[in-house]
UniProtKB/Swiss-Prot annotation:
Cofactor or coenzyme needed: a divalent metal cation
An annotated Gene Ontology molecular function: nucleotide binding
Binding locations of substrate: 18-19, 33, 69, 77-80, 137
InterPro entries the UniProt entry points to: HD/PDEase_dom (IPR003607), HD_domain (IPR006674), YfbR (IPR022971), YfbR/HDDC2 (IPR039356)
Reactions that this protein is recorded to catalyse: a 2'-deoxyribonucleoside 5'-phosphate + H2O = a 2'-deoxyribonucleoside + phosphate
Binding site for a divalent metal cation: 33, 68-69, 137
Entry-linked SMART domains: HDc
Keywords assigned by UniProt, alphabetized: Cytoplasm, Hydrolase, Metal-binding, Nucleotide-binding
Entry keyword Nucleotide-binding: yes
PROSITE patterns registered for this protein in UniProt: HD
CDD domains: HDc
Protein name: 5'-deoxynucleotidase CKO_00504
Amino acid sequence: MKQSHFFAHLSRLKLINRWPLMRNVRTENVSEHSLQVAMVAHALAAIKNRKFGGQVNAERIALLAMYHDASEVLTGDLPTPVKYFNSQIAQEYKAIEKIAQQKLVDMVPDELRDIFAPLIDEHAYSEEEKSVVKQADALCAYLKCLEELSAGNNEFLLAKTRLEKTLASRRSEEMDYFMAVFVPSFHLSLDEISQDSPL
């Protein structure tokens, strides 16, 4: 049997820090970000289905979200101001991401490739799946801003404002529900979120 370096590469996502140009009270790596995006994307899909008549596969969306930044293990996490400095850079970075995604897919053993390729290659996502994952990704970045700001780090103030605009542009009923029901707790301390349910 031929060896594959696929999961050895993915395990290194924990070594790539997000927000590299920002001073962080607590650093966040791509691996933990991906888990949070997967949880939030799953919640958005479940809310969409249960409350607003959606027909999306919540489990598949959670998997897509789990792998949505996998290519960063080869490209690194390019800071947003650099990535979107102009349309040419954004377009070139998309091309680099596509190459990195294909390189990861090529690491998967042949007999498993048809399982993992549609999770890593974002071109295999439906528009609706892509939309939910993008909403979750932006929501998690927004939540990171709230956490940093609540810890007194004003470095994230402009990022929060920028992300509020992004969230407004990606707005959906399920996101509105998530924002109303779950996000307010991110402004509270551990004692405040624990007092209703003591152990």
